[in-house]
Design a protein with these regions (language model features):
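Redox-cofactor binding/interface segments in oxidoreductases and associated redox assembly factors
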Residues: 38, 82, 105, 162
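Glycine-rich, aromatic-lined ligand/substrate-binding cores of catalytic
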Residues: 198-271, 275-280
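C-terminal helix-rich "cap/oligomerization" subdomain common to oxidoreductases
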Residues: 1-3, 70, 81, 329-378
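A structured beta-alpha segment of the ubiquitous adenosine-cofactor-binding alpha/beta core
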Residues: 58-77
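Predominantly a Rossmann-like dinucleotide-binding segment in NAD(P)-dependent oxidoreductases
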Residues: 129, 136-228, 236, 282, ...
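Beta-strand-loop-alpha-helix segment that lines the small-molecule cofactor/substrate pocket
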Residues: 79, 85-137, 152
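N-terminal Rossmann-like dinucleotide-binding module
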Residues: 1-54
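C-terminal glycine/acidic-rich active-site capping loop/insertion
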Residues: 235, 240, 269-349, 353
Length: 378
């Protein structure tokens, strides 16, 4: 079978996330990168392209030029991967959708609710696939929880506690480097830092695992580190449709925490604990207090989730494999589209709709915070 081809916007010199996407796509070998606009500097773009084996004539000076040229080529790319700072997600994604090219975009989807709704509508109008890479939901154990809860095995959800603390931005100018600089810059991040970077992952993790839809939020967004202008610590109270409640905490100055996304879900029949830094296992407490631990690669994992496992139990799979799982499903759907056999039930990745829900969540939190920490409907 001929491999799919893709291009990348962003992901030039020093880009952590661009390199991660390329490695994740390579895990299953379903697509090859053949084009890119890796930097606003054409010299840096060509330098990166040469390092990655991309022909010079497919290293573009702008994303607009790339979208137009690739759409016109008989061998044009099948999809584009957008890994730029937040501020440019919307124009880049829009350009490729208008050119008829499937899109994978890093989160958050964009900066405003209006932009999110436009991208969602445009993808639907053009009949194009659009993935937003909430990477952690590619973990086998996260997929297990989603299926376990959907089958009613936890009963009605009563409350959710979720947190995502990091400590890498505990001091202004320390550790962050290039990655911290743009996140803390309102012009590049869109006026929100911690909540847009970490809070969107929390919102998506809970929504994906539980199926709960946020009804309203009450948020307190703090700016704590001296010299910083955007939030670096957030606490959000959540009420879901149906009456369940939740509490989310995200922080970038929580010294001692690295990438500590955790979700605790409490239902009528028991509870579930999932930890991103210990993502090989799921801990479940049954109604009578019995603790049941399920491990990726071992018996007890829901079959649809277990199918994404690559290695025997005890051979650790992690973050790159999780993103690779998202790209496995995305590539299979793109291939099915090309062959005229695609059906919506094939989708097993976060879509533009999920990305739009994340943007709406962030903006409701902003409104709540600005109004003095009051309840705001989504």
């Amino acid at each position: 079978m001929k491999k799919l081809t893709y291009g990348m916007v962003g992901g030039g010199p020093g880009s952590f996330i661009g390199d991660a996407h390329r490695k994740a796509i390579n895990i299953d070998g379903k697509a090859t990168m053949v084009a890119g606009c890796f930097s606003r500097s054409i010299d840096k773009c060509r330098e990166t392209g040469a390092q990655l084996g991309v022909a010079e004539d497919r290293c573009y000076v702008s994303f607009e030029q790339m979208a137009k040229a690739e759409a016109e080529r008989p061998d044009g790319i099948d999809f584009v991967v957008v890994v730029t700072p937040n501020v440019s997600h919307y124009p880049v994604c829009k350009a490729f959708l208008e050119a008829g090219i499937h899109v994978s975009c890093d989160k958050p989807l964009c900066l405003t609710v209006e932009q999110a709704e436009e991208l969602e509508q445009l993808a639907e109008k053009k009949n194009l696939l659009f993935m937003v890479t909430y990477t952690y939901m590619g973990h086998v154990t996260a997929k297990h929880i989603k299926r376990f809860i959907a089958e009613g095995k936890l009963g009605k959800i009563r409350t959710v506690m979720a947190e995502y603390p990091q400590g890498w931005l505990a001091y202004e100018g320390e550790w962050g480097g290039k990655q911290g600089a743009w996140r803390c810059d309102p012009k590049q991040s869109g006026g929100v830092n911690c909540l847009g970077d970490l809070g969107t992952h929390v919102e998506n993790a809970v929504a994906t695992m539980t199926g709960l839809k946020v009804k309203r939020v009450l948020a307190k967004m703090d700016v704590v580190v001296p010299g910083r202008v955007l939030d670096d610590n957030d606490v959000v109270l959540v009420e879901y449709e149906g009456g369940a409640t939740g509490c989310y905490w995200t922080s970038q100055f929580a010294i001692g925490h690295k990438n500590d996304l955790r979700v605790r879900i409490y239902g009528e029949k028991g509870s579930i604990l999932w930890e991103q830094e210990n993502c090989e296992k799921v801990t479940m407490i049954e109604y009578d207090g019995t603790e049941v631990v399920r491990y990726r690669g071992a018996p007890g994992i829901e079959p649809g989730a277990a199918a994404y496992g690559r290695l025997p139990s005890g051979h650790t799979e992690g973050w790159l494999e999780s993103m690779g799982n998202l790209y496995r499903s995305f590539a299979e759907c793109v291939e099915a589209k090309k062959n005229g056999v695609f059906t919506p039930d094939m989708i097993d990745f976060p879509t533009v709709h999920d990305g739009a829900e994340g943007v709406k969540f962030v903006h409701a939190c902003l409104k709540s915070n600005e109004a003095g920490n009051v309840w705001v409907e989504l």
